[in-house]
Amino acid sequence: PTCIPVSGDHQSKLTLMSESLRNDGRIWVPKIKKDAASIREGKISPLDISEDNRDYFLERRYPAFGNLVPRDVASRAAKERCDAGFGVNATGEAVYLDFAAAIIRYGKEQAHIKGEDESNQDLVNKLGTSVIKKKYGNLFQMYEKIVDQNPYETPMMIYPAVHYTMGGIWVDYNLMTTVPGLYAI
């Protein structure tokens, strides 16, 4: 499942987000590792990465499904990108979920329906943001409260998380069980 990565002491655990966000958002990481490192170090923001330098890895790998691949596929792909050094938050364990294209798409659609100027960027952004706010406003508000970034303007940072277990044994992130020195592989 999709979650907000831990971003500081104020957040004791991962915060689960709705999978429905992937219906409209586009998932990406920088194509260049140096850019990912600069983001992790706080030297640049995701808005500094040009469209050409963004890797929409789910759309690239699964063109027929894009960001709507099953969540286990999306989770594995996001973890693989982060493990390869392209993760974007301070820990390197996050990818971006970007709503800019959806805001424009919905904004143009709404302008067309209302008979208004579809080329007016301010109008399109206002109308599109309104649609996204109606669909995901509570999730965006929760995200902004935790991360202190406006997800209507800056891509969200997300990461896969365990949602529930289906039996088995407990292990930590290094696959060590509760028995010291015993690992489950």
Predicted regions mapped to residue ranges:
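Short coil/turn segments at secondary-structure boundaries
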Residues: 154-158
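An anion/pyrophosphate-binding glycine-rich loop and adjacent beta-alpha core
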Residues: 1-145
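Short, well-ordered loop/turn elements at secondary-structure boundaries
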Residues: 91, 145, 152, 165, ...
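Short loop/turn motifs at secondary-structure junctions and domain boundaries
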Residues: 149, 159-163
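Active-site and channel-lining beta-strand-loop segments
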Residues: 27-30, 161, 167-173
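Hydrophobic packing and interface segments
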Residues: 138, 149-153
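Structured core elements
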Residues: 5, 96, 165, 170, ...
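Short FAD-binding loop at a beta-strand-to-alpha-helix junction that anchors the flavin cofactor
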Residues: 174-185
